[in-house]
Amino acid sequence: MTSPDQVTRPADTTRISDTALIFEGGGMRASLTSGMVVTLLNAGLAFDWVAGISAGASNAVNYLSGDARRARRSFVDFAADEQFGGLRYFARGQGMFNAEYIYQQAGGPDQALPFDWESFQSSTGDMRIIAFDAVTGDDVVWSRKDTPHIEDLMIRVRASSTMPGLMPPVHLGGHVYVDGAMGEGGGIALSQAQREGFEKFVIVLTQERSYRKVPQRFPAVYRSMFRRYPALGEALLTRWKRYNETRERIFALEAEGKAHVFAPERMPVDNGTRDLSRLAAAHRMGLSQSRRELPAMREFLGVDGTS
């Protein structure tokens, strides 16, 4: 009997040039959407333009490297690593998630979660990783030209994934960066794809269709917490509105036949889940749902099912 996590190799690949592939963030909720990464790779669907924010940035670079096993391990098995994070690391100032280890150490050769840099470099798809400048309140958008070396890539994935208050901000090139979900799309790079001319989208969400974000309680607490970075404090307090508006635009595009949307039928984990059995179950759910929805996605993309 075939394991639901088994990785297969496609007979060939189909390049998709007219459609943007967009991965939402969501911390460990990406354990479920990493199942979509596996399905896309096994199906041989090679998108020429891929964007990700926060945990979606990890899904994006794992997809571009063609590493289905790493896609799963990043959000399932790796959570058991004793250096992954926790209160001990938070107390030391390293973050509830030990970001330097996760993004800048574990991905090296012979490390806990090696990243296939050669395969990433040889892949044809371009990428967009988005982070938020905590000082100016602006988004920064990085592409392949900004990442000539693996170290350049991984620190940018880390910056995009840096949850304010839970992980230390990333200092890079004289700027202070945090999670790209604080930016204009609330964590979904739809506007960036539209600015670059795309009119068709495959969008991988990490919340159920019925989900709506609500305003943060106790705004004065957040403004005080981030008083060094007032633009960040305001962005965090208003994120709910930008996020909900972006999702409304996404579902409108879907109704117009311009977007194929993957939204979890049920999301069994939250952004901080570390329980391996729950994370593995979430991954299997994402794998199963994405496989069931693959024919509809192929039809949307205008490709047959032979690859």
Q: Which functions belong to the PLM regions below?
A:
Residues 1-53, 61-307:
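Patatin-like phospholipase
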